[in-house]
Structures are given as C-alpha cells and as structure tokens.
Amino acid sequence: MNSKRIIILAGGSGGHVFPGLTIAKHLIKKGWDINWIGTKNKIESEIIPKCNIKIHFIKIQGLRNSSLKNLIMTPINVLNSYLQVRKIIKNWIPDIILGMGGYVSGPGGLAAWSCKIPFILHEQNKIAGITNKLLSKISTKNMQAFSGTLLNAEIVGNPIRKNIIDIPPPIKRFKNRKGPLRILIIGGSQGASIFNKILPKISFFLQEKAIIWHQSGNNDLQKTRKKYKKYSTYKHIVSSFIKNIAEAYEWADIIISRSGALTVSEITVVGLGAIFIPYPHKDKQQYLNAEDLENNGAAKIIEQSMFTAELIIKILNSLNREKLFIMAKKAYSLGIRNSTSKISKIIHDVSNKI
C-alpha cells in the first residue's frame, strides 16, 4: 500500500513553522510522505532539512513596509509564486495540502484549489490575517486554535511539542516548592529589546524574593547581563536563547512574555501564570491571543505603552506562590493537549474522502 502524501505550507516565523513541524513528525510516524514548501533565508530553510523532510523553496514576499514599486509588482509576484507551487503539486501530486501560515500559504492555497487537491487551513492566532480569511472561503476544512476566529472552523488548539506536553501539571510541580519565586522572562526567540531595557531593574527591588531566568536574544546578551550586574547581585540567569524551553517552563512559577499564539498555547498546556506584554500590532493580535487567560484569572496583560519596571514590581509584590498556583491551575484548565492528534485525524479523514 502506497504512503499518503501531504504538502505542508509554512514559513517565515517559528509561530508557523514549529506547529507545522510537530504535525509533520506525527504524520511521519503514521507512514505519511511529507513535502514542505517555504522560502529561503527564513527559519524553515534551516530547520526542515535537518529533520529529513524535503523542502521546496519559492520566491515570495509580503506586503508589509513594501515600496510603491513592490506594491505595483504584487500581482505579478503572486502569480509567479502561484505558478511555482502549482508546478510542485503537479510533479508530486499530494493527497492533501495543509496551510499553517506565512507568505507561502496564499499562493499555496490557491494552487491547491486550482489543482482540486483538498486544502485544509490552520489559523494559530485569535485574529486571522487577510490571507487566511480569504483562503478560508476556498479551503476544504478550516481549523482554529482559539474560538471565534474563522467561520465554520473547528477548534483544535495549536500543536505543541511532546516534551512540553509531558511537563507535570501544576498540582505536581508546585507541591512542596519553596524558596524565592522563579520568574521566567522571554521576549520571543530573538528576545525583545524593551524587555532587556526595562526588566533587569526588577531584580534590584525584588532582591532575595526572586530568582530570574531571562532570555535576551543574542544581540542584547552582553548589554542585558551588564544591566543585571548594575542593578543587582541577586541570583539571575541571562541566556541568549533557552534551548530546552520545556525545562524553563517546568522550573518557573510565573512567566513574563509576549503573547504570540504558540507561547500562549504552550503556557495553557503547561499551566503557568503569566504577565503578558503583547507586541503592539495594529490589529491587537497578541493582545487578543492573551485575553481569554486574563478573563479567566490566569494572566495579567500590560499594554506596551503602559509597560514599566515599577508596574511589573507592583504586580509581582501582590503575588505569592499560592496565588501563582491558582493562576497556573486556571491556565491549565484552558489548555488543549491533544491538538496534534486532532489535526492528524482531520487530515486523515479529509484525505480519505477523495
């Protein structure tokens, strides 16, 4: 019996690539053949080949901050990208195509539709971008991580890596935990400059009450370490990048972070109280990702315009481990821990209807 074939469309950022990769690894174990479509010089070009998954690169660019010349050229560029994907589809003939986001999803979804290949769409964020809103009208099946994002879409959560799902729940982690509060600070895989400027100061005010583990990103590593030394001799760790994020989540009592879709989903799967400082997108994408957690008492949201060390200190001083345990349990109650198997089943069911 021949293996079923799937093309995964995902690129540009870890928020699209890592959920797609989690699905890919799950399907490979079930005997599927995987091809990936992405772009060169983006995160997928480094990660996907290392996983022994065949990747095709297409030329495409987004519209953000584009010049007038690029805007004029957009229809031609989209057509060229569409033709590139269509050629890949015709040469390999997949049973199904999965769109996980990024610039490749637009031409990829159109090519799937024109070739009459079942196309299923997954939206990671609470609010969909214009591309996914349009693609959702021609897709075979729509999936969403959060409720109310797309019409007629099934809520499946975001695919989370197994080592994160396997972290013990809050009731086990917090049992008999003593000592200073453990504060994890993450501004995304590349860090966040505003976090690196503002948050070292909290160590001075919290003193021996807290241990801080701060992911700074590579560019600001030395500057951030100097700031901590300036403000405090109390225990802290500054890392450019935390390779084992599951270890960090398991260690922490609370996280201070952006609220990208994958981060929010991971926090609910783990069960961890949070202070979110959403990236100030015009469409409030990250704010909306975190809103359900705040409404359910699992997190606090501070808009970047209001973000100060003093406000963070005030919030942290109002919390103790007992309160953080309650926040963690509330976060845990919102988690979807079987997202990967849900999506896998949808892929299997849709492909069998051909």
Swiss-Prot record:
<keyword id="KW-0328">Glycosyltransferase</keyword>
<comment type="function">
    <text>Cell wall formation. Catalyzes the transfer of a GlcNAc subunit on undecaprenyl-pyrophosphoryl-MurNAc-pentapeptide (lipid intermediate I) to form undecaprenyl-pyrophosphoryl-MurNAc-(pentapeptide)GlcNAc (lipid intermediate II).</text>
</comment>
<keyword id="KW-0472">Membrane</keyword>
<feature type="binding site">
    <location>
        <position position="286"/>
    </location>
    <ligand>
        <name>UDP-N-acetyl-alpha-D-glucosamine</name>
    </ligand>
</feature>
<keyword id="KW-0961">Cell wall biogenesis/degradation</keyword>
<protein>
    <recommendedName>
        <fullName>UDP-N-acetylglucosamine--N-acetylmuramyl-(pentapeptide) pyrophosphoryl-undecaprenol N-acetylglucosamine transferase</fullName>
        <ecNumber>2.4.1.227</ecNumber>
    </recommendedName>
</protein>
<feature type="binding site">
    <location>
        <begin position="261"/>
        <end position="266"/>
    </location>
    <ligand>
        <name>UDP-N-acetyl-alpha-D-glucosamine</name>
    </ligand>
</feature>
<feature type="binding site">
    <location>
        <position position="125"/>
    </location>
    <ligand>
        <name>UDP-N-acetyl-alpha-D-glucosamine</name>
    </ligand>
</feature>
<dbReference type="InterPro" id="IPR004276">
    <property type="entry name" value="GlycoTrans_28_N"/>
</dbReference>
<feature type="binding site">
    <location>
        <position position="242"/>
    </location>
    <ligand>
        <name>UDP-N-acetyl-alpha-D-glucosamine</name>
    </ligand>
</feature>
<dbReference type="Pfam" id="PF03033">
    <property type="entry name" value="Glyco_transf_28"/>
</dbReference>
<feature type="binding site">
    <location>
        <position position="161"/>
    </location>
    <ligand>
        <name>UDP-N-acetyl-alpha-D-glucosamine</name>
    </ligand>
</feature>
<dbReference type="GO" id="GO:0008360">
    <property type="term" value="P:regulation of cell shape"/>
</dbReference>
<keyword id="KW-1003">Cell membrane</keyword>
<dbReference type="InterPro" id="IPR007235">
    <property type="entry name" value="Glyco_trans_28_C"/>
</dbReference>
<keyword id="KW-0133">Cell shape</keyword>
<keyword id="KW-0131">Cell cycle</keyword>
<dbReference type="GO" id="GO:0050511">
    <property type="term" value="F:undecaprenyldiphospho-muramoylpentapeptide beta-N-acetylglucosaminyltransferase activity"/>
</dbReference>
<keyword id="KW-0573">Peptidoglycan synthesis</keyword>
<dbReference type="GO" id="GO:0005975">
    <property type="term" value="P:carbohydrate metabolic process"/>
</dbReference>
<keyword id="KW-0132">Cell division</keyword>
<keyword id="KW-0808">Transferase</keyword>
<dbReference type="GO" id="GO:0030259">
    <property type="term" value="P:lipid glycosylation"/>
</dbReference>
<comment type="pathway">
    <text>Cell wall biogenesis; peptidoglycan biosynthesis.</text>
</comment>
<comment type="similarity">
    <text>Belongs to the glycosyltransferase 28 family. MurG subfamily.</text>
</comment>
<feature type="binding site">
    <location>
        <begin position="13"/>
        <end position="15"/>
    </location>
    <ligand>
        <name>UDP-N-acetyl-alpha-D-glucosamine</name>
    </ligand>
</feature>
<dbReference type="GO" id="GO:0005886">
    <property type="term" value="C:plasma membrane"/>
</dbReference>
<dbReference type="InterPro" id="IPR006009">
    <property type="entry name" value="GlcNAc_MurG"/>
</dbReference>
<dbReference type="GO" id="GO:0009252">
    <property type="term" value="P:peptidoglycan biosynthetic process"/>
</dbReference>
<dbReference type="GO" id="GO:0051301">
    <property type="term" value="P:cell division"/>
</dbReference>
<dbReference type="GO" id="GO:0051991">
    <property type="term" value="F:UDP-N-acetyl-D-glucosamine:N-acetylmuramoyl-L-alanyl-D-glutamyl-meso-2,6-diaminopimelyl-D-alanyl-D-alanine-diphosphoundecaprenol 4-beta-N-acetylglucosaminlytransferase activity"/>
</dbReference>
<feature type="binding site">
    <location>
        <position position="189"/>
    </location>
    <ligand>
        <name>UDP-N-acetyl-alpha-D-glucosamine</name>
    </ligand>
</feature>
<dbReference type="GO" id="GO:0071555">
    <property type="term" value="P:cell wall organization"/>
</dbReference>
<dbReference type="Pfam" id="PF04101">
    <property type="entry name" value="Glyco_tran_28_C"/>
</dbReference>
<keyword id="KW-0997">Cell inner membrane</keyword>
